[in-house]
UniProtKB/Swiss-Prot annotation:
ATP binds at M185, L186, H210, F211, R267, G289, Q298. Belongs to the ThiI family. This is Probable tRNA sulfurtransferase. The lineage of its organism: Bacteria, Bacillati, Bacillota, Bacilli, Lactobacillales. It catalyses: [ThiI sulfur-carrier protein]-S-sulfanyl-L-cysteine + a uridine in tRNA + 2 reduced [2Fe-2S]-[ferredoxin] + ATP + H(+) = [ThiI sulfur-carrier protein]-L-cysteine + a 4-thiouridine in tRNA + 2 oxidized [2Fe-2S]-[ferredoxin] + AMP + diphosphate; [ThiS sulfur-carrier protein]-C-terminal Gly-Gly-AMP + S-sulfanyl-L-cysteinyl-[cysteine desulfurase] + AH2 = [ThiS sulfur-carrier protein]-C-terminal-Gly-aminoethanethioate + L-cysteinyl-[cysteine desulfurase] + A + AMP + 2 H(+). Pathway: Cofactor biosynthesis; thiamine diphosphate biosynthesis. InterPro entries: Rossmann-like_a/b/a_fold, ThiI_AANH, ThiI_fer, ThiI_N, THUMP_dom, THUMP_ThiI, tRNA_STrfase, tRNA_sulfurtransferase_ThiI. Its EC number is 2.8.1.4. Catalyzes the ATP-dependent transfer of a sulfur to tRNA to produce 4-thiouridine in position 8 of tRNAs, which functions as a near-UV photosensor. Also catalyzes the transfer of sulfur to the sulfur carrier protein ThiS, forming ThiS-thiocarboxylate. This is a step in the synthesis of thiazole, in the thiamine biosynthesis pathway. The sulfur is donated as persulfide by IscS. It comes from Lactococcus lactis subsp. cremoris (strain MG1363). PROSITE patterns: THUMP (PS51165).
């Protein structure tokens, strides 16, 4: 079957429930769609109250369709053929389309929407006229109003007529950014990218905070984390990647805290740093990939001791999931194979052999009195480096910009 499409009609998901904020949600979804399709300048994207329209202008439909299936906030979309707003031409194009898509034994239905009320026929008359032309040209034609094999949608707009027959399922959820901004603690593991994905699905715009401890962690580990952030851009556009210099803090903790408390105190410092970054950059929540009971720092006792350093809400999207459930999502969003690459992050490099599973808060506070907590956090926050990850080829763009600078 060869059908050349001219436009894609996008239908919104949960936006129908958003009342007075509907316009904001629609504009944000349109922005996200434009970002995801930014390298295809021939596209023209228009968003209106109940749907968005993407004029292809010769762009590769298959590539556009593949990207749209991942954008949160889209319920479904339909590729359309644009034809002249004239009954003889509409009939001719309907017959030509049915020759491509309609087979003996199938049922069909015509569903017309008339946005141009000055058109010569109303919706009912159009349904009858186009149904008749199908019967006239296909002896085996059989109409069925409920759940037909093919529903031909005909939309009469001011500029032209649009024919469509496919509904492609979107990602659902809410447009990224409509729930505000959150800061994702992105390691190089399996869990945190999945947590980021699930936060994106509910409309949270994420900035990815990654703790790097050179020379203990390698440039490869840093690139891996950026590549993981890039995998998440397909769901709603560019992500700001925030690299935190963490070497001083980890060396100080290792020198001044008992081995059993290294992990707990390290996580407390991470929480302090990410909370400061969140505050400075207008975030509302902290997001991490903790899964209850998976490792020593993710018991209820450990989480309680770590959380004590902040009053900011901490969202843990995968907290109740089994590892297999998390892996299933990681494979679905194409982060799993990256996550299992053998680069150590700052937590694994300094991990003690027998960490406390139920650390006492008073002990954490006592050990931290040996350190310049505020000064260390200040220096880490002042040393952050920001990178805009605008797609999976972010490193090529970075190289091109560097070459231009030279």
């Amino acid at each position: 079957m060869t059908v050349l499409y001219d436009e894609i009609m996008v239908r919104y998901g949960e936006l129908s429930t958003k009342g007075k904020n509907r316009g904001y949600f629609i504009n944000r979804l349109a922005k996200n769609i434009r970002e995801v399709l930014a390298d295809m300048p021939e596209l023209k994207i228009t968003a209106v109250r109940d749907r968005a329209h993407i004029e292809l202008n010769g762009a590769d439909y298959a590539e556009v369709s593949n990207r749209l299936t991942k954008v949160f906030g889209i319920q479904n979309f339909s590729p359309s053929i644009k034809v002249e707003k004239s009954m003889p031409i509409i009939k001719k194009e309907v017959v030509a389309l049915f020759k491509e898509i309609y087979s003996e034994g199938q049922t069909f239905k015509i569903a017309t929407r008339r946005a141009d009320h000055n058109f010569e026929l109303d919706s009912t008359e159009l349904n009858i006229a186009l149904g008749d032309v199908v019967f006239d040209n296909f002896s085996y034609a059989k109409v069925q109003m409920k759940k037909p094999d093919i529903t031909l949608r005909v939309e009469i707009r001011q500029d032209a007529t649009y024919l469509s027959f496919e509904d492609i399922k979107g990602a659902g959820g809410m447009p990224v950014g409509t729930a505000g901004r959150g800061h994702l603690m992105l390691s190089g593991g399996i869990d945190s990218p999945v947590a980021g994905y699930l936060a994106l699905k509910r409309g949270v715009e994420i900035e990815a905070v990654h703790f790097a401890s050179p020379p203990y962690t390698s440039p490869g580990a840093l690139k891996k984390a950026k590549d993981l952030a890039a995998k998440l851009t397909v769901f709603g556009g560019a992500i700001t990647f925030i690299e935190v210099p963490f070497t001083e803090i980890q060396e100080e903790i290792k020198a001044k805290a008992p081995q059993a408390y290294l992990m707990t105190i390290t996580r407390r410092f991470m929480m302090r740093v990410v909370d400061r970054v969140r505050e400075e950059r207008g975030g509302k929540v902290i997001i991490n990939g903790e899964s209850l009971g998976q490792v020593a720092s993710q018991t209820l006792g450990s989480m309680s001791a770590i959380n004590e350093v902040t009053n900011t809400p901490v969202i843990r999207p995968v907290v109740t999931m089994d590892k297999n459930e998390i892996i299933e999502i990681a494979e679905k969003i194409d982060t799993f194979n990256l996550s299992i690459l053998p680069f150590e992050d700052c937590c694994t490099v300094f991990a003690p052999p027998s960490p406390k599973t139920n650390p006492k808060l008073e002990n954490c506070i006592q050990y931290e009195k040996r350190m310049d907590v505020e000064g260390m956090v200040d220096r880490a926050v002042k040393g952050i480096m920001l990178t805009t990850i605008a797609g999976e080829n972010w490193d090529q763009t970075e190289e091109e910009e560097f070459a231009d600078f030279l």
